[in-house]
C-alpha cells in the first residue's frame, strides 16, 4: 500500500513536499481544490507528471518530437520506394540474423538478409526489377525469417504488417503485402465532437442475422442507417485489430496494424468510417494495448526468438487469467510501436478516438485480479501501481489530443482510479471519459437476487450518481460483457424463454413479458438520464435482443447461431421488439434536443422506498420513475426548482412503446409555490405503476 505524506509527520516537510509538487505540476492546485482528499498523494501526482514530462523531453531530444516518434509505421515494416524498390525495417534485438522471404523469391529463406543497425534494428533495401517494376507486387505473401541466437530458424509476420489473412483450413494467418495502386480517398470530413455522447457499441462480424461472419460492406449498408435512425452519434467498433481467434471477441490481438481481414479489405473499413462521418456519426476504435496474443507464428510473441522482445520477460510478461503477453511499457521501441499504432488508426482509417480496453490490468501490477476496490485512496497509489503503464496512457492521450483535439478517449477501468479522467496538466491520466462499470452489475444483481418490491431506490440512485466530480462517465445498462455466453442480456434476464413464444402482438401480454418490456424501458431511461455524461448501448440490446453471444468454437461445434444479431425482429410489425426499439430511438432524440448528458449532474429530489418512486431534474426536465410493480399514484406531489406549466415529452406507457396508455398527453401540469423535498415548487402528477415519465417546463426557453 502507499504511504501518503501526512501533516502529522513533520508539518514543515509536508508543506515543502506539497509546494514542490504544486510547482512541478502546472494545474495540480486545481485538482486538489476539486478533491482535497488527494492532498496526501500530491507527491505521487508530481512523480507521475515528471516521468511523463521527462519521456516527452527525451523523445524530443532523441527523435525530434512525438510527432516523428509516432510515425514508426512509415519506416518499419515493408514499403515501396519512389524508384520501385522496397525498404524493409524491423526491431529484433534478440535476433542473430533477419531475412525477408515470400512469393517473390520462391520462399528462399536467406537470399535477402537485413543489415544490422544500432539498438536492435535491422534494415533491407531491395532494388526494383530491371524494367523498374516492383519485385514484390501488391498481394504477395511475405515472411520475416529470424535466426535466433540458439540457432533456430523462425518464420514470422512483421509486427507492422498492414494486412493478414487466413486461407482455407490454415491454422495460422499469412502476411499479405498490401500496396494497392489506388488508396481509398475519404470524401467526408470528421464530424464535430458531439456535446453529448450516445455510443452504439458494435461488432462487424456479428452484425448480420445470418450464421456467418458479416462484412464491412454489410455493416456500412445495413447497420449504419439503423444506428443513425436510432439517434446514436457515435459508434464504438470492437474486434477490428486483427485477432487470430474469432471467439476472443477481438481481445487477443495478433497484428496491431492490420484491420481484420475476416470482414473485408482495409479500403472497405475506410469506407465504413467515411460513410459514418457522412451521417454525422463519429467512430471510436476499441484499442487493445493492455495485452497481446501468445501466438508466435502469426503474433508478436517471441518475434525475435526471445520472450522479452515486445513484452516483459519471465512471469511479469504473462497475464495468467487472460493467458496473454504483457507489454514492457518502459521500453523505447515498445513506446514507439504503441504510439505509432494509435496514430495509424487515427490517420489511416480516420477513427475519432479510442476506448482503451483493460486499463485496470495496465494500471496495477496485480492487474486487478482478486482485488475488491473499496475506494480507499491508498489503493490507487504506491508500489502496486505500474507507473510505466500509466505514463504510456498519459503519452497516448497527449498524442491523441495533440493530433486531433476533438478526439475522444475512454478508459475501461473498474478500479475507479482518481484523476484518470483529469487533464494531464493536473497530473491526471488525460482520458475524456471512463466507463461506469458498476451500473450494469447493479441491474443484473437486482434482477437475479431481488423481488421487484424489494428493490432499493436509494441504492439504485447511489450507483447511478456515484462518480467523481468533473470526471465524465459513460453510463450503460449493459454492454457486450453482459451478453456473453454464461450471462444474459437484460431482456433475457427479464423475459427468458417467454421471448421465444410470447412476443407476438397477436397474443395478450403475459405477466412476464409485460414486466420485462416495462422494466427494460425504465432501466435504460434512468441509466441514460442519471448515470453519466455519456451513454452506451451494445448492438441489438436497444430492442431487447434475445439470447446471449457465443462465437463459433469447439465447445459449440463451431456454431454461428449465437454469433449474430437478429435485426429483422424489430422490423416485424407483429412482434413486440419494435416497441423497445421505438423507445430507444425517442429517448436518444429527446436527449439530442435537451442535452441532459452534457448538463450538470441531476438533482435527485425523491427516492421513496415504500412508494418505489425516484424523481430528479436535469437539463430543465423533470424525470419521474415509478418502479412499484402494482401501485399507481393519483395526484402524487413531485418537487421542482422552477415554476411553470409542465407537459409530458416522453411516456414509457405510450402505445408505440408497448405501454398501457394510462396517461393523457394533452394534460397540463401546473406547479405551485409549495415546497417539497427541498424544492421551492411542486406539482401533482398521476404516476401509473412501472412507468417512466419526462416532463418539460414549457414556460422555460427550450
UniProtKB/Swiss-Prot annotation:
**Full protein name:** 1,4-alpha-glucan-branching enzyme
UniProt cross-references to PANTHER family, sorted A to Z: 1,4-ALPHA-GLUCAN-BRANCHING ENZYME
Similarity comment text for this entry: Belongs to the glycosyl hydrolase 13 family. GlgB subfamily.
| Keyword flag Phosphoprotein | yes
**Mind telling me which CDD domains this protein's record contains?**
AmyAc_bac_euk_BE, E_set_GBE_euk_N
Q: How does it assemble?
A: Monomer.
Question: Which EC class, in a word?
Answer: transferase
- What InterPro entries does the record point to? A-amylase/branching_C, Branching_enzy, Glyco_hydro_13_cat_dom, Glyco_hydro_13_N, Glyco_hydro_b, Glycoside_hydrolase_SF, Ig-like_fold, Ig_E-set
Q: Where does (1,4-alpha-D-glucosyl)n bind?
A: 107, 143
* Feature type site, description Transition state stabilizer: 481
Query: Pathway, per Swiss-Prot/TrEMBL?
Result: Glycan biosynthesis; glycogen biosynthesis
Amino acid at each position: 500500500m502507499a504511504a501518503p505524506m501526512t501533516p502529522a509527520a513533520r508539518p514543515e516537510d509536508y508543506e515543502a513536499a506539497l509546494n514542490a509538487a504544486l510547482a512541478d505540476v502546472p494545474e495540480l492546485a486545481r485538482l486538489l481544490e476539486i478533491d482535497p482528499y488527494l492532498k496526501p498523494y500530491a507527491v505521487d501526482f508530481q512523480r507521475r507528471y515528471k516521468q511523463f514530462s521527462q519521456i516527452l523531453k527525451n523523445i524530443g531530444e532523441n527523435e525530434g518530437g512525438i510527432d516523428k516518434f509516432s510515425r514508426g509505421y512509415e519506416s518499419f515494416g515493408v514499403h515501396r520506394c519512389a524508384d520501385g524498390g522496397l525498404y524493409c525495417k524491423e526491431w529484433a534485438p534478440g535476433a542473430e540474423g533477419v531475412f525477408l522471404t515470400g512469393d517473390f523469391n520462391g520462399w528462399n529463406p536467406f537470399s535477402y538478409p537485413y543489415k544490422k543497425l544500432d539498438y536492435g534494428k535491422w534494415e533491407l533495401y531491395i532494388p526494383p526489377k530491371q524494367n523498374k517494376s516492383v519485385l514484390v507486387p501488391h498481394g504477395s505473401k511475405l515472411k520475416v525469417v529470424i535466426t535466433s541466437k540458439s540457432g533456430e530458424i523462425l518464420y514470422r509476420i512483421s509486427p507492422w504488417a498492414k494486412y493478414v489473412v487466413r486461407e482455407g483450413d490454415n491454422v495460422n494467418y499469412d502476411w499479405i503485402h498490401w500496396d494497392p495502386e489506388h488508396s481509398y480517398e475519404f470524401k467526408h470530413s470528421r464530424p464535430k465532437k458531439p456535446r453529448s455522447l450516445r455510443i452504439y457499441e458494435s461488432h462487424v462480424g456479428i452484425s448480420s442475422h445470418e450464421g456467418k461472419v458479416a462484412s464491412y460492406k454489410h455493416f456500412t449498408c445495413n447497420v449504419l442507417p439503423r444506428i443513425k435512425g436510432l439517434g446514436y452519434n457515435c459508434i464504438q467498433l470492437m474486434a477490428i485489430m486483427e485477432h487470430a481467434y474469432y471467439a476472443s471477441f477481438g481481445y487477443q490481438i495478433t497484428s496491431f496494424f492490420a484491420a481484420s481481414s475476416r470482414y473485408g479489405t482495409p479500403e472497405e473499413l475506410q469506407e465504413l468510417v467515411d460513410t459514418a462521418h457522412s451521417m454525422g456519426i463519429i467512430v471510436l476504435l476499441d484499442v487493445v494495448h493492455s495485452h497481446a496474443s501468445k501466438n508466435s507464428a502469426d503474433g508478436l510473441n517471441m518475434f525475435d526468438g526471445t520472450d522479452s522482445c515486445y513484452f516483459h520477460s519471465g512471469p511479469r510478461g504473462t497475464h495468467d487469467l487472460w493467458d496473454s503477453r504483457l507489454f514492457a511499457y518502459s521500453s523505447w521501441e515498445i513506446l514507439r510501436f504503441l504510439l505509432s499504432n494509435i496514430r495509424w488508426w487515427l490517420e489511416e482509417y480516420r477513427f475519432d478516438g479510442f476506448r482503451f480496453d483493460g486499463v485496470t490490468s495496465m494500471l496495477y501490477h496485480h492487474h486487478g485480479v482478486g482485488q475488491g476496490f473499496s475506494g480507499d485512496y491508498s489503493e490507487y497509489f504506491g508500489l502496486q501501481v505500474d507507473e510505466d503503464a500509466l505514463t504510456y496512457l498519459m503519452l497516448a492521450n497527449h498524442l491523441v489530443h495533440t493530433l486531433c483535439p476533438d478526439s475522444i478517449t475512454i478508459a475501461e477501468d473498474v478500479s475507479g482510479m482518481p484523476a484518470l479522467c483529469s487533464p494531464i496538466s493536473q497530473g491526471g491520466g488525460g482520458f475524456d471519459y471512463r466507463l461506469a462499470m458498476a451500473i450494469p452489475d447493479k441491474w443484473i444483481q437486482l434482477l437475479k437476487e431481488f423481488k421487484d418490491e424489494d428493490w432499493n431506490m436509494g441504492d439504485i440512485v447511489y450507483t447511478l450518481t456515484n462518480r467523481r466530480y468533473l470526471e465524465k462517465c459513460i453510463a450503460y445498462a449493459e454492454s457486450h460483457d453482459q451478453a456473453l455466453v454464461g450471462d444474459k442480456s437484460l431482456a433475457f434476464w427479464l423475459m427468458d424463454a417467454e421471448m421465444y413464444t410470447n412476443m407476438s402482438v397477436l397474443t395478450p401480454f403475459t405477466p412476464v413479458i409485460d414486466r420485462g418490456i416495462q422494466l427494460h424501458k425504465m432501466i435504460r431511461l434512468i441509466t441514460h438520464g442519471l448515470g453519466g455524461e455519456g451513454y452506451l448501448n451494445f448492438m441489438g440490446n436497444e430492442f431487447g435482443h434475445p439470447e446471449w453471444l457465443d462465437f463459433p468454437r469447439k465447445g459449440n461445434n463451431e456454431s454461428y447461431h449465437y454469433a449474430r444479431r437478429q435485426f429483422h425482429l424489430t422490423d416485424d410489425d407483429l412482434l413486440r421488439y419494435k416497441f423497445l426499439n421505438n423507445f430507444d430511438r425517442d429517448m436518444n432524440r429527446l436527449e439530442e434536443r435537451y442535452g441532459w448528458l452534457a448538463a450538470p449532474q441531476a438533482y435527485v429530489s425523491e427516492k421513496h422506498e415504500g412508494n418505489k418512486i425516484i424523481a430528479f431534474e436535469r437539463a430543465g426536465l423533470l424525470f419521474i420513475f415509478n418502479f412499484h410493480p402494482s401501485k399507481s399514484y393519483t395526484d402524487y406531489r413531485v418537487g421542482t426548482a422552477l415554476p411553470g406549466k409542465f407537459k409530458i415529452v416522453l411516456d414509457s406507457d405510450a402505445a408505440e412503446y408497448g405501454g398501457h396508455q394510462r396517461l393523457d398527453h394533452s394534460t397540463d401540469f401546473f406547479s405551485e409555490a409549495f415546497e417539497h423535498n427541498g424544492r421551492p415548487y411542486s406539482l401533482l402528477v398521476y404516476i401509473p405503476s412501472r412507468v417512466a415519465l419526462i416532463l418539460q417546463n414549457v414556460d422555460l426557453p427550450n
